[in-house]
């Protein structure tokens, strides 16, 4: 950790090699285009390298979480800067569906693809709430929306995702 903090090039390279795939996976949760995610990762690692001195290392898990937060925040910033967010009213409501489908037989990559097909703001709220475990209050502040809007977007995202899952499972039956 000291070599990284002192800016030793080989140590920074090892840090990048160790966490770049993890960072890419997080970026792809928010932004489905790999080229755009690469831009976000470049910005993220610049931020990681320049602020590593202020990071309080408490083991491997704390470093990984810190890197994940930086990538998530930078991805949301990127989406906001490029105006990828839609208003909630721009997306029609999905009809009510009976119950949540069972996702046990769906491969993680397939589920990630489905999440990637959600509208940008739906995908962002869903990822922050489910994977990052942020409260709606914090999501609302980050995205510049009301807390109730974050809750509504999450509910709609969950419904849209459930519909995609049901359609996928139905297609697998035949």
What is the predicted function of each stretch?
Residues 5-6, 29-32, 45-60, 81:
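Sigma70-family region 2
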Residues 25, 39-46, 61-73:
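Structural recognition of an alpha-helix C-terminal capping motif at a helix-to-coil junction
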Residues 141-146, 159-174:
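C-terminal edge and immediately downstream basic/flexible tail or linker adjoining helix-turn-helix-like DNA-binding
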Residues 84-108:
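Internal acidic/polar
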